[in-house]
Amino acid sequence: AHAWAQNILPVYQDRADEEADLIRGIEGFKAVHGKAPSGFISPRGTPSPDTVELLVKHGFKWHSDHFDRDVPYLIDNPFGDLAAVPFTMEVNDMPLYIRYGNEPEAFTRILERLLDGFADTHTPKAIVDLTVHAHVFGRPFGAIELRKSIEAAQKRDNVWITTHEELAKIVHPDF
């Protein structure tokens, strides 16, 4: 899930309002998908001090408002198990296209540069998110670049194309 509304940031909400929006988002997700979401990313990656507790309380298994590591880990908290699936911004249509005004092809070009140069970082494993938003790349030009990016990743032997949920299952004991 990615919150009920993108213009409401948990970091600016009180606990009751954040929980009400979270529940509204869960119910909306259930209405469309027939099940509750397993994970959550706040709009703009802006959790509040209460977000982790609320996510555990409402049955979430993973949270991606984390930018501090390259691989999933369990969040150290007193409320229960919740996996952090770190989020990356390098290949994200919002900043690349909207904020910095790049042409759509920058999306694929940056991904290919990361994939080509990854071995030089001497990092054994890392997450690289391909992030597209319906209101940004949800047009033919965006679909073209997303397809090209997926094809570029599929050509690599050292790339696992997966979901945040699958990454969370690596570290979450009750998934």
PLM region descriptions:
Residues 89-110, 114:
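Binuclear metal-dependent hydrolase catalytic cores centered on His/Asp/Glu-rich metal-binding motifs
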Residues 1-39, 44-83, 107-130, 136-175:
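Catalytic alpha-helical scaffold of carbohydrate-active enzymes acting on polysaccharides/glycoconjugates
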Residues 77-95:
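A structural motif
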